[in-house]
Amino acid sequence: MSGAVLLDLDGTLIDSNYQHALAWYRAFRTHGIVVPIWQIHRLIGMGGDQLVTAATDEEIERRRGDSLREAAAEEFAALRDECSPLEGASELVTELERRDLTVVLASSSNEDDLEFFLDLLGVKDAVDGWTTQADVEKSKPHPDVILAALQKAGTSEAVMIGDSRWDIEAAAKANLPTLAVITGGWSEQELRDFGAAAVYDSLTSLREGLDETPLRPRSL
């Protein structure tokens, strides 16, 4: 039984993965680089410091990485108002707080986006802290975000909740299990194959099944 939970933001609590994919697609196109959008979607969950090389190569990262990240941020800013909380997101966070769990958002978003999404969710008072890109040197699948979130939670043990391969891999490198949801566009089988401890078809299903996870009350 864990006393802390780390929550991914994009694709897990906020329906934003496809907006991020479109933003990156457009950013690449403005630099004359065509990357199929389905391939970009598979990389969402990585931060921009990892995504450029993964989508293209080290030469493009070296020559254009910073300008591509800047362009992607501008494109996403234009799409951000189209993002919305995923069904059951606020209720899940509220339930985690009700269980007296330490709740930390494990994100490498910039501070502005994170504050915007916290306001959308309406759960700022229900979380104990969060990470942003300023807290990490390398984004997922490196464990920096997870380790920074653990530090804010004041523990070395927690459960990760996420939607992607990159969440699972980052958590595993910090020896944490992941409860995964398919809300980010990865299939149940894929998430299981990458090592998720359990997979849920919605945040509501996850909330209703919490007593079957390490987040159950200690009395159970």
Q: What do the PLM-derived regions correspond to, one by one?
A:
Residues 25, 29-31, 51-58, 82, ...:
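Substrate-recognition/cap helix-loop segment adjacent to the acidic, metal-dependent catalytic center
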Residues 23, 51, 113-116, 170, ...:
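Phosphate- and divalent-cation-binding pockets in alpha/beta enzyme and binding domains
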Residues 159-200:
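Acidic, Mg2+-coordinating phosphoryl-transfer loop and its flanking beta/alpha structural elements
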Residues 19, 43, 47, 71, ...:
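Short beta->alpha linker loops
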Residues 13, 85, 103, 138, ...:
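Conserved SAM-binding loop
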Residues 2-99:
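N-terminal helical cap/lid subdomain that shapes the substrate entry/recognition surface
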Residues 42, 95, 117, 148, ...:
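Well-formed, non-transmembrane alpha-helical positions, independent of function
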Residues 34, 61, 124-128, 197-200:
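Conserved H-loop
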